[in-house]
Amino acid sequence: MSFYNHKEIEPKWQGYWAEHHTFKTGTDASKPKFYALDMFPYPSGAGLHVGHPEGYTATDILSRYKRAQGYNVLHPMGWDAFGLPAEQYAMDTGNDPAEFTSENIANFKRQINALGFSYDWDREVNTTDPNYYKWTQWIFTKLYEKGLAYEAEVPVNWVEELGTAIANEEVLPDGTSERGGYPVVRKPMRQWMLKITAYAERLLNDLDELDWSESIKDMQRNWIGKSTGANVTFKVKGTDKEFTVFTTRPDTLFGATFTVLAPEHELVDAITSSEQAEAVVDYKHQASLKSDLARTDLAKEKTGVWTGAYAINPVNGKEMPIWIADYVLASYGTGAVMAVPAHDQRDWEFAKQFDLPIVEVLEGGNVEEAAYTEDGLHVNSDFLDGLNKEDAIAKIVACLEEKGCGQEKVTYRLRDWLFSRQRYWGEPIPIIHWEDGTSTAVPETELPLVLPVTKDIRPSGTGESPLANLTDWLEVTREDGVKGRRETNTMPQWAGSSWYYLRYIDPHNTEKLADEDLLKQWLPVDIYVGGAEHAVLHLLYARFWHKFLYDLGVVPTKEPFQKLFNQGMILGTSYRDHRGALVATDKVEKRDGSFFHIETGEELEQAPAKMSKSLKNVVNPDDVVEQYGADTLRVYEMFMGPLDASIAWSEEGLEGSRKFLDRVYRLITSKEILAENNGALDKAYNETVKAVTEQIESLKFNTAIAQLMVFVNAANKEDKLYVDYAKGFIQLIAPFAPHLAEELWQTVAETDKSISYVAWPTWDESKLVEDEIEIVVQIKGKVRAKLMVAKDLSREELQEIALADEKVKAEIDGKEIVKVIAVPNKLVNIVVK
């Protein structure tokens, strides 16, 4: 057989690994550890797509490489299995979401195993397993005990027809719900919040210690959004009312000509004049129909209403009209802004729209034409005139503090984490509300608080989750006869994924989240690989929970993930017509190398695009494994380009990877393998070991595979192959194409044992040194010959070789040699006349 029969070989080795528990996590305390973590998937009904294996293959290569280097390797997999699609499916079909989830997990697991990943399945976790979410609930009770979990009235996106609140992302730009197209209103509701803001400074500062890309760190820094500025208090004219504004530029206070409150601000009703009351009520209603995203869109037309009231500018006593406008959010900052239209574009547009005064306080622009947003010396600012930004801020803050109407303030863009969902399919929040007005956490001895099985998971209609319908579960009575009601909100999907990497370390512990000694042994995670779409929320939430558990003494490290790597996206092929509209692949035919719309006959342009069901360009790994084999898929996805690049899927590229594996198979199975080394491949082999080792370490898998190809080409030029080089090469390719490597190892090593723990090959530095080098021979300063000579020859030897060369002889024939200058390892210069 001169080709690699994947249909026979791959299932054979997958069966072997499962039967022998080949990838069970090592526990030898004398060995170093390596914890390779994948972002665990949500097991959707669609199954794996070819984007999933890219990250999984990367961690698998590292895990196999580290095992061969003698490390204890922890390489686990699990399921982030709570989520809306399962609940939606259950509502549509009347089936239990747990059954749907279980079927999906079985399918995902089958697909993952077919790709030959070296997971330790004894450590599998599932966020919907009560034995798992017992500890998710336990963490919540600890947050509650420490005052970091609290209830608050929060405006939510309420959809009356759906009987539930929806996330900002589920609100369409026209203010209707994504599902059903129903009206969405902003309505205050009781919600659970987690006080992530208490950790803002630590979440910010500790980023410096992490081996993460600067772009991801910057995304987190921006999300946390630390600002140093001042709180300024404005009195409302003719009343005892006042309100506070946070500003990063208190030095521009002399240019503040009006103030804007969020329509929901608590002062609005109290300060609105009777003449403006109707307009204000109407505007507040309109604002409640919009999502936060729509309200803060910079491109939208500025709208607002004057309340009829005035604020007093604390530095110059001038009256400033108080407006309400939907671009100011009650949930952000203090819900009030001081407007400096000369130096802020949004304020400038608002001032122009409503004919409000614009006062320049920083020189350098023409504020009648546009806002000047650069820095400049202060003007029209009394005691700040002529000062730069830094000095002016210091002076104005001192003045405000002296007057008692302001002080320096550090704020964060980060908001507390809205932690409750009005859904059924999530972890029950372990809190009981008693009729005497108190609330208590469910005691640890009663955890897990198990999600009750029910067919009735329609929304309750009251804004509570479907759990409010389940009276038997809902109502409880204390020993003293006091009646209570369980919390009906469930946790968001983020909860289970905020700590799953800890449970992998000790997944079957019934007494605690995980054993302290095991946590000390394995933390932090050495490499975490996943998509950049989780750069902010998931990673921030996991870091927050980890720091909280560190404060409790549960975990020994301040940070969970030492190194983070985001793989790129695998794009599908798309087709566009002359208008730029996308055409589904099943409506396209290829003729003479061009692409045409089957129905219209129009020639189409081919371009990469994100894989999607609507474009029918999703590639299923099952089809690839069936046709080409898992090893081909693994090698192709690693060879496509740099791991962090987004690259289009290509059948031609897949075929190229398959041909390479067939060449490897033929090289090892058909070449004569000898016990003696003739030295012909010394340099090529040692270069390959060195390059592949270094490139795996630095996650440059595409260049590692390119080097393996270089060796195959070199080896194919020889008649025979030295057995140690054959073995070493098989070991080098094993992390990339493990099934093929196992099969070839059996033949060459004459063993029935797995290659997985065979010591990684080493290289001989002396074999990398060139024995010969090229020198140039110059005559009268012009290069006349290039010669391969032994390295480090003496001047005399070089001169002798150069003068004996036929080409040189012909050039100097009949001429007198004046002198010969020889520079070892470089050149020979012959001067003639």
Curated annotation (Swiss-Prot):
Single GO BP term: leucyl-tRNA aminoacylation
Binding-site positions, ATP: K613
Gene3D superfamilies tied to this protein: HUPs, Isoleucyl-tRNA Synthetase, Domain 1, Valyl/Leucyl/Isoleucyl-tRNA synthetase, editing domain
UniProt-recorded Gene Ontology molecular function terms: aminoacyl-tRNA deacylase activity; ATP binding; leucine-tRNA ligase activity
Plastid among keywords: no
InterPro entries referenced in this protein's UniProt entry, alphabetically: aa-tRNA-synth_I_CS (IPR001412), aa-tRNA-synth_Ia (IPR002300), Leu-tRNA-ligase (IPR002302), Leu_tRNA-synth_edit (IPR025709), M/V/L/I-tRNA-synth_anticd-bd (IPR013155), Methionyl/Leucyl_tRNA_Synth (IPR015413), Rossmann-like_a/b/a_fold (IPR014729), tRNAsynth_Ia_anticodon-bd (IPR009080)
E.C. number(s) listed in UniProt: 6.1.1.4
Sequence motif: 'HIGH' region, positions: 41-52
A GO CC term attached to the entry: cytosol
Alphabetically ordered keywords of this record: Aminoacyl-tRNA synthetase, ATP-binding, Cytoplasm, Ligase, Nucleotide-binding, Protein biosynthesis
The keyword Transmembrane appears for this protein: no
Location in or out of the cell: Cytoplasm
Catalytic activity: tRNA(Leu) + L-leucine + ATP = L-leucyl-tRNA(Leu) + AMP + diphosphate
Highest taxon listed in the record's lineage: Bacteria
Primary location recorded for the protein, binned into one broad class: cytoplasm
Chain positions of motif 'KMSKS' region: 610-614
Family of this protein: Belongs to the class-I aminoacyl-tRNA synthetase family.
HAMAP family cross-referenced by the UniProt entry: Leu_tRNA_synth_B
The protein's name in its UniProt record: Leucine--tRNA ligase
Organism for this UniProt entry: Streptococcus pneumoniae (strain CGSP14)
